[in-house]
């Protein structure tokens, strides 16, 4: 799911009418769900780039059929290792440094919850929010997210660029962190 969420950051460079997923299969409902997430998460991108005729019906086609013998065949990975269930009980709070995460941390503290903060690419505001909440460093999960340099170079050359559904990236990556931590 995280890869599917990150996909749109790269798709927006060319707005290809077809997306071909080779890492597994997706059913029709799943394809429709991803298409809906991408389309509705790209409103600012469409506006900034003057894309006025965008309609979900002709937005993109997603193909996701795993070839015979490939990983993810029919969504099954019989030899895949199972991730351990989280060893730390409590609540994982994504922290972006704004009022939403600050209020959430404060309310959970008052409720006596075991709190873990989750930060993507820590910076001043996120670190200050965690500090203000009184969380120790061992209660903070920090991850680094980088974008491909080729994509950034294409953006510099004038290829399409703009906002993508970052909240979805936070949601899916925090689920992975919660499961593994």
Regions found by a protein language model. Give the residues of each.
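Conserved adenosine/adenylate-binding substructure
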Residues: 153-181
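RNA-binding accessory domains that recognize and position tRNA/RNA substrates
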Residues: 1-90, 102, 107-147, 159, ...
């Amino acid at each position: 799911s995280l890869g599917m969420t990150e996909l749109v950051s790269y798709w927006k460079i060319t707005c290809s009418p077809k997306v071909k997923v080779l890492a597994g299969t997706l059913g029709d409902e799943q394809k429709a769900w991803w298409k809906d997430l991408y389309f509705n998460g790209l409103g600012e991108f469409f506006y900034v780039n003057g894309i006025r005729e965008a309609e979900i019906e002709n937005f993109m086609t997603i193909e996701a059929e795993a070839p015979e013998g490939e990983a993810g065949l029919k969504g099954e990975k019989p030899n895949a290792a199972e991730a351990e269930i989280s060893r730390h009980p409590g609540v994982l709070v994504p922290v972006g440094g704004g009022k939403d995460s600050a209020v959430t941390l404060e309310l959970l503290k008052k409720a006596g919850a075991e709190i873990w903060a989750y930060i993507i690419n820590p910076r001043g505001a996120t670190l200050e929010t965690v500090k203000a909440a009184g969380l120790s460093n061992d209660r903070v999960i920090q991850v680094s997210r980088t974008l491909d340099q080729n994509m950034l170079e294409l953006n510099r050359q004038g290829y399409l660029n703009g906002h993508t559904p970052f909240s979805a990236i936070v949601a899916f990556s925090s689920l992975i962190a919660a499961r593994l931590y």
